[in-house]
Amino acid sequence: MTTVDGDTIYEYDPLDRLIKTTTPDGESTSMTYDGVGNITSSTDANGNTTQYKYDGVGNVVETIDALGTSAFFEYDSMGNLVKTRLHRVDTQDNVDEWEVTLYEFDGRGLTTKQVDALGNVTTYAYDGNGNLVSKTDPDGYTTEYTYNALDLVTKINYNDAKEVSYRYNKTGDLISMTNWLGTTTFELDLLHQL
């Protein structure tokens, strides 16, 4: 089956899975699937193919890009990503493990800590609704987030004392944003579109 959205062409297999997208300028991307519907490969407009491998519950456990770089993903029993490892294979088939990232989660499955290959730690804190309320980067800079009753962010405070605030109408549409450079106002039509 083939459908057209504007000038972009979408092609589907008999199981209604997207297998090819062609843009108006003729660039195409394509995908292949396994028997349970997982994407096994994707090819971009430049012909670069990435392969995907899965565990028994459908989590991506490995990707291999066109340059031979492999990424491995490990999950906890709740399905949360807890570790990534990147490996590169050189022209002599030597494997170089060059980046490992570790993740920690709270009981709700929200990321609370990320440790990169150099030991740099980023921490995250959340409110009772699961909204991110603070993020502290490896340099100790903290960004804080404030939300309204609809769980929409109303203010972001950056470590350097800069602040961004957001205003919404009664239906939750963003109507203005104010930062250290000034205020931007958004006008919406009856369909709530800019």
Feature map (PLM): residue ranges:
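Beta-strand elements of repeat-based all-beta scaffolds
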Residues: 1-23, 27-44, 48-65, 69-116, ...
